[in-house]
């Protein structure tokens, strides 16, 4: 009976390690039924799978109950993003379910109506930003804080727990249509594009 409910509603696991945290959320239908986040500057690679397992166990579910995965693709910490993207690709392959990449910008923008600018902290006191307007999102940029247009509302990146839930919600909405494999979002000063690197090594 539980499996029938899961299949009808969809069970989506969203997770993110794009900054100094390891965060995950479990979405059943439209409800977040479990979530957890640990602040950590390093060690996400060793910590992530255990966190995901504990989250599923605590909610009374197993890996085979999942219908989709949502993974944060950044921007942010290079190593952290590759850890979660690699995990999502490996899990999607082994479970036979889609893995959907969601940027921190998209996740943060989920509950807001434009125009507004979302931002993620970047090195050297800079910010990764993306403008959302009625015409749609513009290309992400790397800017200094003084370059942000103060005439437009500015929304900092969501806190880790909220971010993981937003990633799961967006992944659930996209799960019914073909999606590209998740890839890290790297942003340079005048350029923004998903990584074209070879796929990271899949985690067992």
Q: Which residues make up each language-model segment?
A:
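DPxDG-like acidic metal-binding loop motif
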Residues: 68-98
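N-terminal phosphate-binding loop and adjacent alpha-helix
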Residues: 40-57
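Generic structural marker for isolated residues within well-ordered, non-membrane alpha-helices
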Residues: 52, 88, 105
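Oxyanion-binding and handling regions
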Residues: 1-32, 41-46, 100-204
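Phosphate-handling active-site elements
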Residues: 59-64, 92-102
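Short, well-ordered alpha-helices that flank and scaffold nucleotide-derived cofactor binding pockets
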Residues: 54, 89, 93, 173
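Phosphate/pyrophosphate-binding loops at sites that engage ATP/ADP/AMP, CoA/4′-phosphopantetheine
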Residues: 52-68
């Amino acid at each position: 009976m539980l499996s029938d409910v899961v299949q009808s509603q969809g069970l989506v696991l969203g997770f993110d390690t794009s900054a100094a945290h390891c965060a995950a959320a479990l979405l059943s239908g439209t409800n977040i039924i479990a979530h957890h986040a640990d602040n950590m500057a390093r060690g996400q690679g060793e910590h992530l799978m255990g966190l995901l397992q504990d989250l599923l166990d605590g909610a009374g579910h197993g890996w085979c109950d999942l219908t989709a995965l949502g993974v944060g693709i950044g921007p942010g910490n290079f190593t952290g993003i590759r850890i979660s993207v690699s995990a999502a690709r490996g899990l999607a392959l082994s479970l036979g379910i889609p893995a959907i990449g969601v940027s921190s910008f998209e996740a943060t923008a989920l509950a807001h109506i434009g125009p507004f600018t979302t931002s993620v902290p970047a090195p050297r006191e800079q910010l990764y930003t993306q403008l959302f307007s009625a015409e749609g999102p513009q290309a992400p940029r790397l800017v200094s804080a003084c370059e942000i247009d103060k005439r437009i509302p500015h929304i900092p990146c969501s806190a880790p727990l909220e971010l993981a839930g937003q990633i799961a919600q967006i992944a659930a909405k996209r799960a019914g249509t073909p999606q590209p494999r998740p890839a890290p979002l790297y942003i340079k000063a005048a350029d923004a594009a998903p990584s074209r690197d070879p796929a990271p090594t899949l985690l067992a």
